[in-house]
Amino acid sequence: MNIAERLREVSAHYGPVVASVDSFDVIDCQACGFRHIDPLFSEDELRKFYDGEFYESERSDYFAKAEEDKEWWMLRYRHYYEMLEAHARGRRLLDIGSGPGYFLEAGASRGWDVLGFEPSRMACEYTRARGLRVEHGFFTARDARAHGPFDVISLSMVLEHVRDPIGLIEEARSLLVPGGLQLLISPNDFNPLQMTLWKSLGFKPWWVNPKHHLNYFDLESGRRFMTARRFEILHTETSFPLESFLIAGRNYIAQPELGRACHQERKTFESALFAHDPAQMRAFTAQWTAQGIGREFLVLGRKGQS
């Protein structure tokens, strides 16, 4: 990026600084409608990071942990597919940023025609080894168009990693059939429990990690983001509020070894309810959603005719 291009980018993003970590500011960008770091990484820097470093060095234990969590993930994904099947008019699904491919696997087991796009070569190999279709590379509508159109497109834990979330979701939207569904899942950052811990209980904003996350959505900004892209909102929900462990005194930030234990307890709680009492799980989720708390949020939207 030359100096002129950098100046144009800086002038395009403006808003109050809401956090500063590792020489990066997070601004509540009035142009974009969501929080993001400033300055942004270049596209080349991101490609290098996610094609190799992300799984090979930054998250070398990723696949081992994913396999350990697989049963829990498949229960969550059953919940997601039941929601999609209540609204979808067809069963062709594209998962952008498909990671280890468990969402694809869950869909294929239910008779969906599924395809993933994934920037990590290692994750693609891991997915293909189980007989699932995945394209290696950063998603573009041009590359995906030969496989489309799609009835559902999933963007799960992706928007926080990309330079241009608006451009990405506009490209995804162009591949949806009229009335198609966009599923958006992202970390619920700067949520009320996090803000209490930061502003009142002496914690730093630990969720701000500029090397991994460029953008910081919460439930409300995620909903606005989808509405601004001309999606009719069909459903929103949040997930288990992991920050409740911190408020209860289990400081997994200062003691990382507690983190896996807390995660295991979350899995046990959710798995029992997803498997045996999904109505009760939905009731808990509705309460968390109403308060804007929960570690992740989900927005499901329908594309209009235009």
Ranges and model annotations:
Residues 1-156, 165-171, 238, 259-274, ...:
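Conserved N-terminal segment of class I S-adenosyl-L-methionine
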Residues 167-172, 221, 225:
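Short, conserved SAM-binding segment of the class I
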Residues 234-265:
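Conserved catalytic loop of SAM-dependent methyltransferase domains
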Residues 176-182:
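Short glycine-dipeptide loop
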Residues 185-215, 220-225, 250-251:
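Short, glycine-/aromatic-enriched active-site segment of Class I SAM-dependent methyltransferases
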Residues 156-163, 185:
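Short catalytic micro-motifs in class I SAM-dependent methyltransferases
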